[in-house]
Amino acid sequence: MAVPKRKTSPSKRGMRRSADALKAPTYVEDKNSGELRRPHHVDLKTGMYRGRQVLEPKEA
């Protein structure tokens, strides 16, 4: 059975847990429509991603 050889220091434990904190989602302004969208995601209103039409735009 795997057992730790040394005690994990509070610093190491804290560094490991630093990724667990909740962060506010980031948004960028779309160049074409001016709407807010997540970075590296398709704009759902226009269906554009990186200058290409990848989805059919939603009808309003």
Curated annotation (Swiss-Prot):
GO cellular component, one term: large ribosomal subunit
Signal peptide range in chain numbering: none
Coiled coil: none
Annotated region described as Disordered, given as residue ranges: 1-60
GO molecular function: structural constituent of ribosome
UniProt KW keywords: Ribonucleoprotein, Ribosomal protein
SUPFAM superfamilies, per the entry: Zn-binding ribosomal proteins
Superkingdom of origin organism: Bacteria
Keyword check for NAD: no
Segments of skewed composition (Basic and acidic residues): 28-44
UniProt feature, compositional bias: Basic residues: 1-16
BP GO annotations: translation
Keyword Ribosomal protein: yes
NCBIfam families per UniProt: rpmF_bact (TIGR01031)
Family that this chain belongs to: Belongs to the bacterial ribosomal protein bL32 family.
Alphabetized HAMAP family for the sequence: Ribosomal_bL32
Protein name: Large ribosomal subunit protein bL32
